[in-house]
C-alpha cells in the first residue's frame, strides 16, 4: 500500500472499528485524474446499503481542473466494488446489528487502482471517547517519562 490519498482520522475516535475490508471504487475518468493529483476528502463520508449494493456517500472528490464540461459531480454516490459474500456479510451487520460502514482510508494499490479501506464500526458514547483520550494521554506521558529516564 502506498501513501494514502485521503484518510479519515476522526473515525477511530468516534467509532469502535470491529473489522476492516478493502473495496474498489467505481469512478469516472475525471475522478481518477483528480485523485492522481491527490485531491479527495472522506472525513464526512459514510457507506450505505442501497438495494443489493453498497454506495459511498458524501465523499468529496473535487472537479478536475483541466477537464471540460463533462467533469464529474464532486459529492455523487459512488458504488463500492466488493465480492457478493462480503456485501451480504456487511448488509447483515448493518441491518441486523445496527453497525455503520465508515471509510477509513483512500489509497492506490500496487496495480495503481484506487482502493477504499472501509471499517465495520459501532458508535462510541461520550464516556468511551473520554477513556480513549485518557489512555492516549497516559501513553504519551509514559513515553515522555521513559525518554527522560534514558538520558541519566
Curated annotation (Swiss-Prot):
Lineage: Bacteria, Pseudomonadati, Pseudomonadota, Alphaproteobacteria, Caulobacterales
Keywords: Cytoplasm, RNA-binding
Location of the region described as Disordered in the Swiss-Prot/TrEMBL record: 122-152
Lineage top rank: taxon: Bacteria
Family the UniProt entry places it in: Belongs to the SmpB family.
CDD domains in UniProt: SmpB
Gene this chain is encoded by: smpB
GO biological process, one term: trans-translation
Stated name of the protein: SsrA-binding protein
Protein purpose: Required for rescue of stalled ribosomes mediated by trans-translation. Binds to transfer-messenger RNA (tmRNA), required for stable association of tmRNA with ribosomes. tmRNA and SmpB together mimic tRNA shape, replacing the anticodon stem-loop with SmpB. tmRNA is encoded by the ssrA gene; the 2 termini fold to resemble tRNA(Ala) and it encodes a 'tag peptide', a short internal open reading frame. During trans-translation Ala-aminoacylated tmRNA acts like a tRNA, entering the A-site of stalled ribosomes, displacing the stalled mRNA.
An annotated Gene Ontology molecular function: RNA binding
InterPro entries given in the database record: SmpB, SsrA-bd_prot, SsrA-bd_prot_CS
Basic and acidic residues biased stretches: 128-152
Amino acid at each position: 500500500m502506498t501513501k494514502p490519498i485521503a484518510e479519515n482520522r476522526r473515525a477511530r475516535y468516534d467509532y469502535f472499528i470491529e473489522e476492516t475490508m478493502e473495496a474498489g471504487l467505481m469512478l469516472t475518468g475525471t475522478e481518477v485524474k483528480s485523485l492522481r493529483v491527490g485531491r479527495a476528502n472522506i472525513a464526512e463520508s459514510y457507506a450505505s446499503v442501497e438495494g443489493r449494493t453498497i454506495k459511498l456517500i458524501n465523499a468529496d472528490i473535487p472537479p478536475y481542473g483541466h477537464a471540460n464540461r463533462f467533469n464529474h459531480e464532486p459529492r455523487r454516490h459512488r458504488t463500492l466494488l466488493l465480492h457478493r459474500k462480503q456485501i451480504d456479510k456487511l448488509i447483515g451487520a448493518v441491518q441486523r446489528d445496527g453497525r455503520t460502514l465508515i471509510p477509513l482510508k483512500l489509497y492506490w494499490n500496487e496495480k495503481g487502482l484506487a482502493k477504499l479501506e472501509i471499517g465495520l464500526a459501532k458508535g462510541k458514547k461520550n464516556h468511551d471517547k473520554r477513556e480513549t483520550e485518557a489512555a492516549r494521554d497516559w501513553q504519551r506521558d509514559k513515553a515522555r517519562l521513559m525518554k527522560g529516564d534514558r538520558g541519566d
